[in-house]
């Protein structure tokens, strides 16, 4: 074991880590320590990691964060990465260039409170994806917790509203 990255801040908490298909580029995401997500990147297989400055990231809303959902809130295909958020807002962060530049897209998934938002995201290809979430304080509810996209995450459509699966 060899320590490759350290960050000292009272709010530091990294939720997920994922490597791209080339096994050189990697990304780890964490809750905001300022008004943006905490995202670190590697391009050398994890030997060195660098935090993206807030000036290069979309601004997060207060109480918007990521869920540590068994590492399923990140998806990569080729050089593209999608990351799902929750809490105050349930949005999708997207980069097409290994995390160098970013866009952020709204979703219709339930949001507004701490336990609400997107927990998991997956894509079959660079256009077709699914997001699932809900409200973990109300595990029996299944409203506004599943959405699909066919344009790479720019727009989302609620599906199977009121049907299982629940959160």
Where do the PLM segments sit?
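Repeated scaffold domains used in trafficking and secretory/extracellular systems
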Residues: 12-18, 115-120, 166-167
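Asp-box/BNR beta-propeller loop motif
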Residues: 1-9, 40-60, 93-112, 136, ...
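Oxyanion-binding "anion nests"
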Residues: 116-148
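Short glycine/acidic-enriched loop and turn motifs that connect beta-strands
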Residues: 32-36, 88-90, 136-139
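Entry beta-strands of beta-propeller and related beta-repeat scaffolds
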Residues: 23-28, 80-82, 127-131
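Residue-level recognition of a conserved intra-blade site in WD40 beta-propeller repeats
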Residues: 19, 76, 122-123
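Signature of short aromatic-glycine-proline-rich micro-motifs recurring in repeat-based ectodomains
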Residues: 66-73, 118-120
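A generic, well-ordered mixed alpha/beta core segment in the N-terminal half of proteins
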Residues: 1-9, 14-28
């Amino acid at each position: 074991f060899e320590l490759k990255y350290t960050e000292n801040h009272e709010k530091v908490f990294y939720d997920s880590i994922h490597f791209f298909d080339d096994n050189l580029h990697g990304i780890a995401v964490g809750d905001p320590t300022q008004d943006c997500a905490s995202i670190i990147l590697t391009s050398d297989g994890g030997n060195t990691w660098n935090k993206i400055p807030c000036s290069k990231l979309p601004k997060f809303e207060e109480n918007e964060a990521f869920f540590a959902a068994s590492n399923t809130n990140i998806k990569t295909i080729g050089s593209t990465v999608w990351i799902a958020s929750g809490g105050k807002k349930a949005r999708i962060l997207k980069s097409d260039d290994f995390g160098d530049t970013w866009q952020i897209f709204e979703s219709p998934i339930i949001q507004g409170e701490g336990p609400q938002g997107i927990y998991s995201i997956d894509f079959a290809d660079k256009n077709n994806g699914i997001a699932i979430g809900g409200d973990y304080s109300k595990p029996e509810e299944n409203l506004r917790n599943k959405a699909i996209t066919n344009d790479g995450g720019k727009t989302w459509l609620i599906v199977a509203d009121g049907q299982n699966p629940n959160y």
